[in-house]
Amino acid sequence: RKVGFLFQNYALWPNMTVYQNISFGLANIKEEMPVYNFELKNAARLAEILSRPEDVTKVLDECRDKKGKLDEKKAVIKLIDAFTVSQYTAKKLFAYHLEKPRDMSGEIAPLKAKVDAARAAGLITEDFQVIRDGKPYTAVRKLTKEEIDLSVRRVSRIVKISMFMDRYPAELSGGQQQRVAIA
């Protein structure tokens, strides 16, 4: 991140959760950068994940309590970590209710068709960057919620604090606060 504050108390705002503390600096970046079509990127990623519903079922089975009830919050976090997706994509994935594996070809086909149509029309590159006038498009912009979420989740995995994202700094030990500041 280009914004860095480091004070005696690791510059963690006490009224913001760990997630909000990490994303704060990212939300303030505004510069020229490539423009991506995240709707299509997420559609392609969902199609890829849904093509292997047994993997999703395996992850969801790990999120059951002693009575066999599925913990939605834990499931979303596990999906984020297992498939490296944002929380928004993980919630969409959870909404497919893949607790039991089933044939997902009916859901995969429209997702793939949408992505293939955009690629055939030459609207996006392989990495979903928007193309205008035959060139990848850049603009002065802020990071989208999706980009911020992916960045926050990536750095939280690196410093091993992904399980503390909804906690406040006062609820963390000194070492955990230090890892949040590093992230």
Report residues per predicted region.
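A short, conserved alpha-helical patch in the ABC ATPase nucleotide-binding domain
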Residues: 20, 26-30, 83, 94, ...
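Flexible, disordered linker segments and immediate boundary regions flanking tandem C2H2 zinc-finger modules
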Residues: 31-39
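Conserved amphipathic alpha-helical interaction elements at protein-protein interfaces in regulatory
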Residues: 24, 28, 32, 158-161, ...
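Conserved ABC ATPase signature
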Residues: 144, 163, 168-172, 176
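ABC ATPase nucleotide-binding domain
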Residues: 2-3, 9, 152
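Conserved ABC ATPase "signature" region
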Residues: 38-64, 77, 81, 102, ...
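ABC ATPase nucleotide-binding domain "signature" region
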Residues: 5, 11, 160, 179-183
